[in-house]
């Protein structure tokens, strides 16, 4: 995704012999890697080095599912962020990142259309916010497919906001990838986030199957839908762009697309320090940062 690669352990260089000892130790402990080590447990219960170039040289932390949930819980409970507040910041970050990777001038068709596919949870809410901001940005024409709408005020409000801004909702998802390729310049995958577990149920199974076969680029919000949060999914969709929110998740090491952005400039410094997130500095007033 993203020479010699440098491995840091809490900011200290780990030599080859010490690394070998650590790998053996972690394997004996069942494959969970120490926090802040720049390591991730693979399917063989061993740790492997993150291969993310300069990002990991700065010690950027990649989170497991449990760690990502813990960070979110602290944002909600300790720092008193609301769900809709974080959703707004996340969705805005996604829209801004898309404009940087896919400016309207790069679209091949005359109509700069973007299909935003939203799931039933918070990731889908991020997608609704993203679509609304894309509509406000000059030139983008988003459309939304939202097959499973939660019966909750937050999501009803987000849906109404998009409708009031004349963003069309696509009732039927095209089963043929050629239809999507011909109608849209970009697909935003906002189906499942890092909290998703278990088998993919319909209609999302067919949706992801179709997205695996499209040729237009896909931008995934936080996690490529259908991926294991920590192990990825080589048989799943392979997005051209990944927008990691708060901090990258461990599955991001398997991302091979062209654009990896970090979004959501809302993490308090004390929380960043507690979890050794080592987030890269955001330039100026930007809410996104491109990762190597």
Curated annotation (Swiss-Prot):
Keywords: Isomerase, Metal-binding, Mitochondrion, NAD, NADP, Nucleotide-binding, Potassium, Secreted, Transit peptide. The keyword NADP applies. One of its GO terms (molecular function) is metal ion binding. Binds 1 potassium ion per subunit. The keyword Transcription does not apply. InterPro entries: YjeF_N_dom, YjeF_N_dom_sf, YJEFN_prot_NAXE-like. It is found in: Mitochondrion; Secreted. K(+) binds at residues 123, 189, 225. SUPFAM superfamilies: YjeF N-terminal domain-like. Its cofactor is K(+). Catalyzes the epimerization of the S- and R-forms of NAD(P)HX, a damaged form of NAD(P)H that is a result of enzymatic or heat-dependent hydration. This is a prerequisite for the S-specific NAD(P)H-hydrate dehydratase to allow the repair of both epimers of NAD(P)HX. Belongs to the NnrE/AIBP family. NCBIfam families: yjeF_nterm. This is NAD(P)H-hydrate epimerase. It comes from Xenopus tropicalis (Western clawed frog). The lineage of its organism: Eukaryota, Metazoa, Chordata, Craniata, Vertebrata.
